Amino acid sequence: MSDHQPIQHLVKVTPENGLHLAPIAQLVRTATAYGSAISLSFDGKRADVKSAFDLMLLGAPCGAELTLDVNGPDAPAAAAAITQLFESGFSQHP
């Protein structure tokens, strides 16, 4: 079961209002489609990306760099999907 490698890299918050309700909803919806553990860290705080409450508590403003950590059997696909949301500025429609 330890065949998978954890993935870690930086993502940048680009929405003008930071991580607010709409991007958080997209993150949670995307993350829950994967079995991997997915978290974001910012300013000494860590959030489970499958929890809207955790993500709200991060308080990440526009321009913030967050550390994305993904660990699990589908980590590469999960990391790619979450990264795509950040890179697109959350412009994808659900």
Residue positions per predicted region:
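Short amphipathic
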Residues: H4-P15
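Flexible, glycine/charged-enriched surface loops at secondary-structure junctions
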Residues: D3, H93
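A common structural junction motif
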Residues: Q84-Q92
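Amphipathic, hydrophobic secondary-structure cores in small proteins
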Residues: L21, A25-A81
